[in-house]
Amino acid sequence: MFDVTRVSADVGDGQISFETGKLAKQASGAVVVRSGDTMVLCTATVGNLRDVDFLPLTVDVEERMYAAGKIPGSFFRREGRSGEKATLTARMIDRPIRPLFPKGWHYETQLVAIPMSVDQVNPYDILAMNGASAALAISPVPVAAHVGAVRIGKHEGDFVVNPPEETHEELELDLIVAGTEEAILMVEAGASGVTEAEILDALDIAHAEIKKLCAAMEELQQKAGKEKLEVEAPQIDEALVEEIRASHGQALVDAIATEGKLERYEAIDKVKDEVVGHYAVPDEAGEVDEERVAEVKAAIDSIEKETIRKAIAVEKKRPDGRAQDEIRPIECEVDISPRVHGSALFTRGETQILSNVALGTTRMDMRIDTLGLQTTKRFWHHYNFPPFSVGEAGFMRGPKRRDIGHGALAERALVATIPDEESFPYVIRVVSETLESNGSSSMGSVCASSMALQAAGVPVTAPVAGVAMGLIKEGEDYIVLTDIAGVEDHLGDMDFKVAGTAEGITALQMDIKITGVTFDILRDALEQANKGRQFILGKMAEAIDGPREKLSVHAPAIESIKIDPEKIGAVIGKGGETIRALCEEFEAEIDVEDDGTVRIYAPTGELVDGAVSRINSMTKEAEIGDRYDSAKVVKTTTFGAFVELVKGTDGLLHISNVKPGERVDSVDDVLSAGDQIDVTVVEVDKERGRIGLRLSDDPSVAGKSPQELAAVGSGDGGRRNGG
């Protein structure tokens, strides 16, 4: 019934296998990829031919909680929309594969990855990336090459291929690389400040492993692949191209040189309209041949691309006139939004980002309960890209995949500098609003967010800046560009985003559209990016040169103290009575941990100080000389009165001291339960847990030092500690 084909590749210390012929046989290509007990079903399905001028490719990653033996926590106990992990994985599948589709491929195409089993040792993202390419390999889609993917970690100084998931939080470098047998196409990385040389070493290791995976996919295709569909690439009328170049070429060059993004686009569109009007003339009935219009538009687009690329790569002239390593003018400003806890505005050319910081209590941390190991986050970054940022009107219906990807990239860049919870017990959310965009908005959000964190008083270990690098390669001529603008990104061969501190790289994202990018070119790009990053850090320091010492007056006040774990009961009280009363009195949130750590959160510092003082008094060991005003009598006996000093701790006022200088036959003649009196500790017997008291206005007590009080004593007896 099943004609199963299975191949495998030894990658690092493990094995990745590809199997087809058993599951999802009606898909155009279906592969189960497996490592350990993690198993992902990946399918490639070819639909109908569409009358469009773009590649109709969609990539979906569908997490199923059963894969990890879990039940969804939603009301209906069913998975909803894709989470961040699934979205980021879908983007990592899409980005290296999309450039490999043939030009003119207009069949509806969908790639789907469904994790079927997750062992929480081997993450499913790497398997999904490999499985999607393997599914395409055996499908009718004539992609140009197979794409393999690996994760390279640096742990305790050593590079590790596909490190186990439990070590990911400890990695000095977490690098995901995708590529073909010939070249690297995509890189995603987060790091704690590694050097450019370490990145290149990791890429070299990754490519060697990728070649093994590509070989396995080729073997699978040879054994189980379907016949490929033939696609006729759209042909451009070269004669028409030359005619347009002769008649309107110079006008296009002049339009490209126009200053300002919107003005440049307007000038270019005007030339294009003139070209279409000249070469696609309406017939006698006033109708225009749409095929002719498409031919003319394709020709003028080809001339535009060739003109810009040749000017940059050969003539070393960028559209806005900058040198290859020149960064657009930068303006930095902090404290833009008065009520937020920290804000900063970063403007680089026509790209402008406003980042805002909100601080919260640790109760606001984010629980990550997906197919991987359950974790919590106390720092996250969100990125928004409203349509007005590029001068357009459009729908605003929540974050798109691109927004989620850019937010995650900036988060990786910044997280290495965030202080630990013990030294800064806050949850931190940063939101970057893209107000204008002409390229490199994700790196602009890194810069703005780093300044906003410092303005908020978050004690980051170092400021972080980011810069987007580009590449234009024409034959043997190439040029690496610093701080690419939108047109250079669109028409270029590489988008290489690098973020980091003055000391090293903390995040990296690279997408390469061609195969001829050598390690020498990558080395040049990294070195040039380092120079650009240092320059930007200098500009940021002019606006704010380090974290502020004080938090915003609008930020919640937080204090963390340690108490004796045996005193936790005194803070909590019977049935939580005491801690609830404290929270109400001081408008606070109070968290008590088993090790005696107590965190107090309140709207103001005064309220926090009051709560801290009260908790300290409740948990403090009584010492000779300590005075307790308005202490409550909790019980009277024939030999004295028990007085509550703090919750859980009583002392004894002996009958001989109930009324100084006078004999008392019965304590009840002087005191009753519920009375409030001022007492002073005059005796502490820790071995027997007894505390002896005298009235604070007793002449034998007033004005005495602890040593003198110890000599006075309590008269008789004492009282156990703990009531």
Please report, for each region that a protein language model flagged, where it lies by residue:
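Flexible, glycine/charged-enriched surface loops at secondary-structure junctions
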Residues: 103-109, 144-146, 213-231, 262-263, ...
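Single-stranded RNA-binding regions, centering on S1/OB-family and related RNA-binding modules
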Residues: 556, 565-723
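Long, basic N-terminal domains or extensions that often function
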Residues: 1-232
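Conserved phosphate/anionic-ligand binding catalytic regions in large, soluble enzymes, centered on
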Residues: 29-31, 39, 122-140, 334-357, ...
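Mobile "lid/hinge" segments at catalytic clefts and subdomain interfaces of large enzymes
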Residues: 140-259, 453-549
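Glycine-rich, flexible beta-strand/loop modules in the N-terminal catalytic cores of phosphate-handling
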Residues: 27-110, 115-122, 181, 188, ...
